Amino acid sequence: MLGTIGVLLAALFFGAIGMTAMFRPHNLLKDFGIETAAVDSRNEVRGIYGGFPIAVSGLLLFSLTRPDLSNGILFALAACSAGMAIGRIISAIVDRHLGKIPLLWGMLEVIVAFLIASNITAR
């Protein structure tokens, strides 16, 4: 059981995604063939790929300080990470294709879901 280390690694993962989206939005999506040349597209990247992961990272860190709230926080965030991976699987089935980059991100999302879930305790 990875416990606290797993939560810290997951917080680092989401924090890095969020900060990259905030300050280098074009870097985050270029490997997927998505352009962020328009101002509105960068706003979208910063909002969704920046703001959400930064909030997730903050909640993961907060969960380490509040054992009374941690199980709910960790369960919800593990489900979010797993949900992203499930979305990739559904996309691969519908499109009959899964590229190397989406596969890599999907594997990372599954690993992160397990890292987060490893700190959920029975009560």
Whereabouts are the PLM-identified features?
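Core segments of alpha-helical transmembrane spans in multipass integral membrane proteins
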Residues: 42-64, 79-80
